[in-house]
Amino acid sequence: ILACGGGVGIAPLLPIIEGFKKAGNRVISVLAARSKDLIILEDEVRKWSDEVIIMTDDGSHGKKGLVTQGAEEVILREKVDECIAIGPAIMMKFTSLLTKKYNIPTQASLNALMVDGTGMCGACRVTVGGKTKFTCVDGPEFDAHQIDFDEMMMRLGGYKKEEKADMEQYMSK
């Protein structure tokens, strides 16, 4: 199992790693963040992983680079039966593109905006395999090779202006 986690996506990845390890799988985890300060739960992930590769954008911890570079390093040296990716949408998109190239089944856990948790509002809708799915009721895990990440990222950015204004108001207090 290749487990790829980025930023706060490492947190929900931890129990998945633990479950795969307890089931007797070899687990290699690739953790990534912009800098050392943003790598979370490293010790806990190490407890349940056979190997951990750390990637940081600035090279302040582990290797300098992206999660996909660490993942491809693993893919090129040993057989990977499945990949799990949780993190920023852009990270999951490029992890999915990488694993698709090597025909590795990949699951992504989406962090789409959710409002009501029932699918009624439609805020978390995402296109998977050409069909509309609702992250809150149909997911959050989906076949990463079927997800329209570009559409999802566009929808995730829909409230950036409001988020920025709220942050500025909060910081000015």
Residue ranges: model-predicted function:
Residues 39-41, 79, 118, 133-136, ...:
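Short linear functional motifs in flexible/disordered or boundary regions
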